[in-house]
Regions:
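An anion-binding loop in the catalytic cleft
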Residues: 1-93
Length: 93
């Protein structure tokens, strides 16, 4: 799916039901994200700020996220304790 479509779903599905992904059995709801221009394998986390490749040299940069059962967090706060690191692939999670 294109980065633009994913951004549209994030914005269109907020606040409910929301756009989410599953990583290591946990659900993460993306609350805010922007379009970015980086390349990598689809679903690959490109840096330590949770920028996720979507192909065609485009990616989504997550700005706000909510881990299942937790409060919403800005991405800087979230990444301090996150197990999702650069190089992780969310397609294989």
């Amino acid at each position: 799916e294109t980065a633009e479509n994913i951004i549209g779903k994030i914005n269109g599905l907020y606040p409910s039901p929301g756009a989410f992904f599953i990583h290591k059995g946990e659900r993460y709801k993306i609350l805010k994200a922007d379009l970015a221009y980086s390349s990598g394998e689809n679903g690959e986390v490109l840096n330590n700020y949770l920028e996720i490749s979507c192909g065609n040299k485009k990616s989504i940069k997550v700005l706000e996220i909510q881990r299942q059962g937790k409060r919403p967090q800005n991405i800087n706060e979230f990444m301090l304790g996150s197990q999702i690191k650069k190089g992780s692939n969310l397609n294989n999670a």
